[in-house]
């Protein structure tokens, strides 16, 4: 596997750990409010949903780390989880914020392209 692809995949996994922390633990704190442009009231009303979404982001990170841990045998695992991240990013960009296209979908697409070209 390409070192560049694995570095990008690791960065995508780290991003999703960061999303997990923001959504599960910091959603209604100053860092979470700033990151998502939320008011305290809106954050309080959506806290449970955000925590659930954060958990899913943790599963994406875990899948990518699992794929990396398998070395060359993890190719299909990495492809699967990168495609999941890409689809989630495209959906988020279409329904929530265009910024998600660049923060989530683009890194996954770059990782997927590097992986397939390796």
What are these model-derived regions, one by one?
Residues 107-118:
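Small-residue-rich segments of transmembrane alpha-helices in multi-pass membrane proteins
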Residues 24-46:
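Cytosolic, membrane-interface loops and tails of multi-pass inner-membrane proteins
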Residues 2-26:
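N-terminal signal-anchor transmembrane alpha helix
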Residues 43-59:
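Interfacial helix-start motif at the membrane-water boundary
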Residues 24-32, 72-73, 97, 101, ...:
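Transmembrane helix-loop junctions in multipass membrane proteins, especially transporters and channels
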